């Protein structure tokens, strides 16, 4: 347990602000923690949360991040190695080709759930559709956007989940 705390503290005290140094540092930490797609997650994080273009990430090796940006990056690394899902960190997941806001109030939509959309597309259209336990609202929203049902409702007993679903509408 102490080793983990020391490890986590050393992450927040990394001294370089150079983008390339930070990327290499993150990749090294992730590879040691068996995060298999760590390189891709780092790129996505830099694009989504620090608004860096892929060109900047791949070619501007001398770019210096501001201290605030560096701290965001290091916190991302810390959260990831502590097991927090990547989608919660960037507050985004893709479902059926559309980005949805997610946070710990909702489950991250599973790719397998997209099969429900495929089945409904073949069998529909329907007059009504009800998504019980709507969470992020992804299923109800995709059903509505694809005109699979004339009227779609999403229900959830969790008010925070309903806030997320409403935000995604």
Residue ranges and their predicted role:
Residues 59-61, 67, 71-148, 152-167:
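SAM-dependent Rossmann-like transferase core, predominantly class I methyltransferases
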